[in-house]
From Swiss-Prot:
<feature type="transmembrane region" description="Helical">
    <location>
        <begin position="105"/>
        <end position="125"/>
    </location>
</feature>
<feature type="transmembrane region" description="Helical">
    <location>
        <begin position="280"/>
        <end position="300"/>
    </location>
</feature>
<comment type="pathway">
    <text>Capsule biogenesis; capsule polysaccharide biosynthesis.</text>
</comment>
<keyword id="KW-0448">Lipopolysaccharide biosynthesis</keyword>
<dbReference type="GO" id="GO:0089702">
    <property type="term" value="F:undecaprenyl-phosphate glucose phosphotransferase activity"/>
</dbReference>
<keyword id="KW-0270">Exopolysaccharide synthesis</keyword>
<dbReference type="Pfam" id="PF13727">
    <property type="entry name" value="CoA_binding_3"/>
</dbReference>
<feature type="transmembrane region" description="Helical">
    <location>
        <begin position="46"/>
        <end position="66"/>
    </location>
</feature>
<keyword id="KW-1133">Transmembrane helix</keyword>
<keyword id="KW-1003">Cell membrane</keyword>
<dbReference type="GO" id="GO:0016757">
    <property type="term" value="F:glycosyltransferase activity"/>
</dbReference>
<keyword id="KW-0812">Transmembrane</keyword>
<dbReference type="GO" id="GO:0005886">
    <property type="term" value="C:plasma membrane"/>
</dbReference>
<dbReference type="Pfam" id="PF02397">
    <property type="entry name" value="Bac_transf"/>
</dbReference>
<feature type="transmembrane region" description="Helical">
    <location>
        <begin position="82"/>
        <end position="102"/>
    </location>
</feature>
<comment type="similarity">
    <text>Belongs to the bacterial sugar transferase family.</text>
</comment>
<keyword id="KW-0472">Membrane</keyword>
């Protein structure tokens, strides 16, 4: 097979996979509404076809914005599935709003929910099947990419090992090329010098080259890239940014200029919309459910000690902006935010009712109003006293990065036991470690998991005084 034939076959198969994805998505959306009408005894007519068309147009538009129909080769299935479910959820909500405002369709809410869930189920079933089909063709030689690595940065070695351990991805690793063996990987992976790599690329025996070299090797990188312009290889650069404790590993393009965020919030674009919807829905439902409890607690606080029912504390919110956080008053003496003394075991300032509220986290229930008003999130790093921020930002590297998202009522640190008094630097460091881990790995599913586990792990804690 000639070089051109190989490249044509690879690209053709990639296009076929993309077409399969689009066709299956169209089919699922239409079959979903048909199934929903059938289950709920509605006659399927042109009106519902038009509704499905609206949903499909919106879904395709959002897919274009989120670049959903790109190649998912090498990306975990969970990432692909989460994005398609996000796209469909937003498309469904927009379609529902459009239908409610501009039409008189008589579909019940139950029918709409059936449609939404049926399409979700369809995506969950078909996406793995398409992946499995693509993996099968790659195993037998179709849609494969012959890849090589220039340099041996740890990030490059990690990517290489992923390709070797997961052959269904369709990457055939030729080896690592560098002018001298660095000794950071198995000798069998060493394929030659950079000049050998360039020669192989010119012969057409390599489809893709990953440059995994230090930024200090700028001259060598430029020289190599210049010579690779005389080939038809795809050349990709693995940024040497993983030496930083980065929050987000993604790339952006601004007016044609590629940028790599080092410290940025994961809540951009559609993620921000979904996070806010999550907060509004969850906080509203919880406030409705706990309204009798709020009334009982407010009465107990008011009748057992002098002072207001609600205690408002100044805390740092998203981007370090001050917010006022609501809590049920649990002390006889108010804290001064300029000089905060943390509550300790047997603290005489804590009332009898307050002791129970603090040990069960019930004193924090009014913060769901903060969530509803947009100052906080249900899930996020817990807000610290202003004086603590000023103290620990100089002691713990990356402390202020926790303010790249809204503070939360519960968080990853809390369900892992890092809640209550932080009387040592080590305890605070551990809490910050979990806060940053949450920001790096944020997803709607992680939020839901934390909310679920909070019910069992996050409320009762002996270290909360």
């Amino acid at each position: 097979m000639t070089i051109s034939q190989h490249r044509f076959r690879s690209n053709a198969n990639a296009s076929i996979i993309s077409m399969l994805q689009r066709f299956s998505d169209i089919l699922i959306i239409f079959l979903g509404i048909y199934f929903s009408c059938f289950i709920n005894d509605y006659f399927f007519n042109l009106h519902y076809v038009l509704m499905a068309l609206v949903a499909l147009v919106v879904f395709q538009m959002i897919g274009g914005i989120t670049d959903f129909y790109r190649s998912w080769r090498g990306v975990e299935f969970s990432v692909e599935l989460i994005l398609i479910l996000k796209n469909w959820s937003l498309s469904f909500l927009l379609t529902l709003g459009f239908v409610t405002l501009f039409s008189d369709f008589d579909l019940t809410f139950r029918t709409f929910i059936f449609w939404y869930l049926a399409v979700c189920a369809g995506f969950v079933v078909t996406r793995p099947l398409i992946r499995a089909l693509a993996g099968f063709f790659r195993r037998i030689g179709y849609n494969k990419r012959r890849v090589a690595f220039a340099g041996s940065l740890p990030a490059g070695i990690s990517l290489l090992e992923t390709f070797r351990k997961q052959p269904w991805l369709g990457f055939e690793v030729k080896g690592i090329y560098e002018d001298s063996f660095s000794g950071t990987y198995d000798l069998e992976l060493y394929a030659g010098k950079i000049s050998d790599l360039i020669n192989e690329a010119r012969k057409g025996t390599i489809d893709r080259i990953y440059i995994a070299m230090h930024m200090r090797d700028e001259v060598a990188i430029k020289n190599m890239v210049s010579q690779l312009t005389d080939t038809t290889c795809s050349v990709l650069y693995i940024p040497d940014v993983f030496t930083f404790n980065i929050l987000q590993s993604r790339t952006e393009e601004i007016n044609g200029v590629p940028v790599v965020p080092l410290f940025d919030s994961p809540l951009n674009g559609i993620n921000m919309v979904f996070k806010r919807l999550e907060d509004i829905i969850v906080s509203s439902l919880i406030l409705i459910l706990i309204s009798p409890i709020l009334l009982v607690i407010a009465t107990a606080v008011k009748t057992t000690s002098k002072g207001p029912v609600i205690f408002r504390q100044v805390r740092y919110g998203m981007d370090g902006k001050p917010i006022k956080v609501w809590k049920f008053r649990s002390m006889t003496v108010m804290e001064n935010d300029d000089k905060v003394i943390q509550a300790t075991k047997n603290d005489i300032r804590v009332t009898k009712v307050g002791k129970f509220l603090r040990s069960t986290s019930l004193d924090e229930l009014p913060q769901f109003f903060n969530v509803l008003f947009g100052q906080m999130s249900v899930v996020g790093p817990r807000p610290h006293a202003v004086s603590h921020n000023e103290q620990y930002r100089s002691l713990i590297q990356g402390y202020m990065l926790r303010h790249k998202v809204k503070p939360g009522i519960t968080g990853l640190a809390q369900i892992n036991g890092w809640r209550g008094e932080t009387d040592t630097l080590e305890k605070m460091e551990k809490r910050i470690e979990y806060d940053l881990l949450y920001i790096r790995g944020w997803s709607i599913w992680l939020d839901l998991k934390i909310i679920f586990l909070t019910v069992f792990k996050g409320f009762i804690n002996k270290s909360a005084y």
